[in-house]
A protein has these predicted regions:
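Terminal leader/tail segments of proteins
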Residues: 2-11
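Short strand-turn-strand beta-turns centered on an Asx-Gly dipeptide
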Residues: 13-17, 254
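Short, structural beta-strand-to-alpha-helix junction motif
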Residues: 25-29
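Protein-protein interaction/assembly regions in multi-subunit complexes
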Residues: 34, 38-39
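Serine/threonine-rich, repeat-prone extracellular segments and beta-strand-based repeat modules
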Residues: 41-48
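Short linker/helix segments within small regulatory modules
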Residues: 47, 201-203, 263-269
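Fe-S ferredoxin-like electron-transfer domains
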Residues: 54-241, 245-249, 257-258
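Cofactor-/ligand-binding subdomain signature composed of acidic, glycine-rich
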Residues: 141, 259-295
Length: 295
C-alpha cells in the first residue's frame, strides 16, 4: 500500500541526502528514489504494512531548529513509517546492521538447512538477506524444532511449517487481494502458523499467488516441486491464453520443456497476480499429442 493519493510533498533526509517525497509515503518506498533497498520479508507494496518481521529497521530522527538531529531511542520499521517534514533516516549505521543481524539470527534459529533441496533456493529473500546482512556463523547448538513438512494445503500448494517465518504475506493476500479469507494464523507466539479453517483444503481461485510471495519457500508448488533450480531455467515473457483477460506471465523452461508459470507485472491487466487456471493448468503444454504442423 505504498501509493499516496495526495500530491502534498515533504522534505526528508536519507543518509544525509535531501529528498522530496509525497507526504505519508512509506519510508521503505521513499529510499528507492535514491537507489537504496531496505531488506524486507513481511512488507509487500500491494498490501497493508504490518511490521511483523522487523527486518526493515532504520534509525530515525527529526531535524531541530539549530540544525542538530534528535534521534529516536530505538530503530523504527521503515515499512510502517510514513514520510513527514524534517524526518531524518539512516539506513547504513552500526545500530541498523546490528539489529538486522539480530533479526536474522532469531529467524534462522529454527529454520531448517533445506537450501540444497528447497524449491526457493537461488531466488530466496531469506538467503539473500542472510548473505548481505546476517551473521556468518551460528551460535545455536540446541536441537531445532520439528514441524510437519510437505503438508498438502491443496492439490496445488504444499506447506512446510519448519520454514515459515510468520511474515503473514499469505494470510494477508487472502484477506486483502483475493478476498476469500481462506488462510489465517492459528496458535500464538512461536507456535503461530498459517492454516485453513479446521484444516480443510485451501480452496481459492488464486491460491498459486501465495507461492510467489512467500519469501522463504514455506509454500511451494506441488506441480513444480523438485523439478528444477532457478539457474537451470530459461524465462520468457508471455500472455496467458486460458481466458480472454490475457494476463501477463513469465514462462519458465528447462531443457526446452515447460515447467512453471509466474505472474508478470502489468498494472493495466493483472497487476502481478495469476489465477490457478493460468498458473497450474498447463499440463497440455508438453503433451506429445499437440499439433506441431498445420493439418
Amino acid at each position: 500500500m505504498a501509493a499516496v493519493p495526495n500530491t502534498e510533498t515533504c522534505t526528508i533526509l536519507v543518509n544525509d541526502v535531501e529528498l522530496v517525497v509525497p507526504k505519508g509515503e512509506l519510508i521503505v518506498e521513499s529510499v528507492k528514489r535514491l537507489g537504496l533497498e531496505i531488506p524486507i520479508f513481511c512488507y509487500h507494496p500491494r498490501m497493508k504494512p504490518v511490521g511483523m518481521c522487523r527486518m526493515c529497521l532504520v534509525e530515525v530522527g527529526t531535524k531541530q531548529p539549530d540544525g542538530s538531529v534528535r534521534k529516536m531511542p530505538k530503530p523504527q520499521a521503515a515499512c510502517t513509517l510514513p514520510a513527514s517534514e524534517g524526518l531524518v533516516i539512516y539506513t547504513d549505521t552500526e545500530m541498523v546492521h546490528r539489529d538486522r543481524r539480530g533479526v536474522l539470527e532469531f529467524l534462522l534459529i529454527n529454520h531448517p538447512l533445506d537450501c540444497p533441496i528447497c524449491d526457493r533456493g537461488g531466488e530466496c529473500p531469506l538467503q539473500n538477506n542472510t548473505l548481505f546482512y546476517g551473521p556468518s556463523t551460528s551460535r545455536y547448538l540446541e536441537i531445532k524444532r520439528h514441524l510437519p513438512k510437505a503438508y498438502p494445503l491443496s492439490q496445488y500448494v504444499t506447506l512446510d511449517l519448519e520454514r515459515c517465518i510468520q511474515c503473514g504475506r499469505c494470510v494477508r493476500f487472502t484477506e486483502e487481494i483475493s478476498g476469500d479469507h481462506q488462510l489465517a494464523f492459528r496458535f500464538r507466539g512461536a507456535s503461530m502458523q498459517p492454516s485453513t479453517f479446521k484444516l480443510t483444503d485451501f480452496e481459492s481461485k488464486f491460491s498459486g499467488n501465495v507461492i510467489e510471495i512467500c519469501p522463504v519457500g514455506a509454500l511451494t508448488s506441488a506441480k513444480y516441486r523438485f523439478r528444477a533450480r532457478p539457474w537451470d531455467l530459461e524465462t520468457k515473457p508471455a500472455q496467458c491464453t486460458n481466458c480472454s483477460v490475457q494476463c501477463s506471465i513469465w514462462f519458465d523452461y528447462r531443457s526446452g520443456r515447460f515447467v512453471r508459470v509466474n505472474g508478470r507485472t502489468n498494472e493495466f491487466v493483472n497487476e502481478e497476480w495469476t489465477c490457478d487456471k493460468g498458473k497450474f493448468g498447463h499440463d497440455w503444454y508438453n503433451s506429445e499429442k499437440r499439433l506441431t504442423t498445420p493439418l
